[in-house]
A protein has these predicted regions:
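Intrinsically disordered, low-complexity N-terminal segments that are enriched in acidic
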Residues: 25-107
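Active-site neighborhood of thiol-dependent amide/isopeptide-bond enzymes
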Residues: 153-233, 247-250, 255-261
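C-terminal tail/sorting-segment detector
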Residues: 341-352
């Protein structure tokens, strides 16, 4: 082969503004997750390698009827599975698709009770204590100083975790963008949902408390990442510092409302032949390609059911109401709305 090109793609984790915490709670839905690959130029003799996360049943969801149109599902550990395709790419456009049934498992941790732990048998929490030096760097000066300060103020591990959650939410700004390293997050003073999760996970692991990222897609479209941590009395405890940052008056500690399809937990390592990734967030997909002749490349686009299926449109009613603050269905304040008509929670909102 004349030329080798490698592409890694991780899409920005953006917070969906159209998701209801309660509309689909504990309901089962059919869902499709796919990547569309398209050739550009006139290349031929193409080998395509595609790697995308595949959901499994865990603390927050039940997955059944998992199927794909190509490739194979590979379990890389007890918490994560991937759909891996390695083969020819002969057409100008081709999809790698996985479909499944999804049922949410909303969680509210009752801290007055310890008899029902939120955990899945077989997943060792100690697997979420390590440091990769990029996303997780337990020697980072800011993490060390902040962690020591909050630990000194805390009465126990649970108190420390809540202080970390509140600290991240109140001391960092929400800044749009793609995944950042820990050093980049601290340097710019904030980040998006994945970055808020990274800060929390680092603070927890620094004190020997297992913690991880939960990465996925909203059932109604968009991406989100939030962390959880392990406590010996309660199991895995979900928190969302991003939501807390946007809505400081609400409480997202020990609460998961069941509206996210989790595609992977923690950072992912994967090796197959000449393909290797080490400790990376796998939320959407990675791909690589090689070609024998011609000029051009291969583009990849991630899509979910919401991106290309329309299940009908409800009739529209006009209802004019004057309000000072506009919230999404997650109870989060919506800043930076445009003057004119905005579509919020399926309604037209006019901003003067």
């Amino acid at each position: 082969m004349r030329k080798q090109t490698i592409y890694n793609v991780i899409l920005c984790s953006v917070l969906s503004l159209y998701t209801s915490f309660s509309a689909y709670a504990q309901s089962e839905i059919a869902f499709t997750n796919k990547v569309t690959y398209t050739k550009t130029g006139s290349i031929s003799g193409v080998r395509l390698v595609s790697l995308m996360p595949a959901p499994i049943t865990n603390e927050y969801q039940e997955i059944s009827e998992l199927a794909s149109n190509c490739g194979e599902f590979i379990s890389i550990n007890k918490a994560n599975k991937v759909l891996f395709y390695d083969g020819p790419f002969n057409n100008n456009s081709s999809d790698v698709t996985e479909s499944f049934m999804y049922k949410s498992k909303p969680i509210r941790i009752d801290f007055s009770k310890t008899e029902n732990k939120n955990e899945v048998t077989g997943i060792d929490p100690n697997g979420y204590l390590g440091s990769d030096g990029t996303f997780i760097d337990l020697s980072n000066t800011t993490i060390v100083n902040t962690g020591d300060q909050l630990w000194a103020e805390s009465s126990n591990k649970l108190d420390y975790a809540k202080r970390c959650y509140e600290y991240v939410a109140s001391h960092y700004r929400y800044i749009n963008g793609s995944w950042r390293t820990l050093a980049q997050i601290i340097s710019i003073g904030g980040g998006e949902c994945g970055d808020f999760a990274t800060l929390f996970v680092n603070l927890m692991r620094y004190k020997g408390i297992p913690a991880r990222h939960n990465m996925g897609v909203w059932k109604d479209g968009g991406y989100h990442v939030w962390p959880d941590f392990y406590h010996e009395d309660y199991g895995w405890i979900p928190v969302d510092p991003t939501f807390k940052n946007s809505n400081p008056g609400a409480d997202y500690f020990g609460r998961y409302d069941g509206n996210l399809i989790i595609l992977s937990q923690g950072l992912t390592s994967f090796t197959s032949g000449d393909i290797n990734i080490e400790e990376v967030p796998l939320q959407t997909f990675y791909y690589w390609y090689w070609y024998q002749s011609g000029n051009g490349g291969v583009d990849g686009v991630h899509k979910t059911s919401k991106d290309y299926l329309v299940n009908g449109i409800n009739s529209v009613k006009t209802n004019i109401e004057t309000v000072g603050t506009i919230l999404n269905l997650n109870g989060m304040k919506l800043p930076h709305l445009k003057r004119g008509i905005n579509i919020i929670n399926g309604k037209k909102v006019f901003v003067k």
